[in-house]
C-alpha cells in the first residue's frame, strides 16, 4: 500500500460525523431486532439538543428495509415501552389550508424505559408465581 492509499483509508474512517451514540442499555430492554432497528434510526436522525426528529414511516422503512405498516407496529411498541413519545404535527399548505404532517418523535430518557421494563418483568413474575400457587392476581 502506498502513502496515498493509506491517507485515503484513514480519511474514510476518520471523523465522528459518521457515527452516533447508541446506549448499551437498549439490550437490557427485551427489544426485538425490528424495534432496535427503528429505534436506532430515530436516534440517528434526532436533533441532539431537542432529542426530536420527524421522519415519515416511509423514510424509516426505506432506511431499515421494512414496510410502512411494519414500521408503525414497531413505533407503537417503542411508545408502549416508553422509549419514545410521538405527537402529530400539522403543516400549512400553499393554499392556506392545514393538513397532517409527519409525526414528531421525541427520544425519551432511557431510565424511564428501563424502569418500565423492570416493572413489567415484576408483574409477569408475580402473575407466574400466583398461577403456580393456584391463586389469581387481585
Q: What is the role of each PLM region?
A:
Residues 56, 89-116:
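Short, cationic-aromatic polyanion-contact patches
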Residues 57-61, 74, 104-106, 124-127:
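Short, low-complexity, polar/charged sequence segments that are solvent-exposed and flexible
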Residues 72-73, 81:
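A general lysine-centric signal
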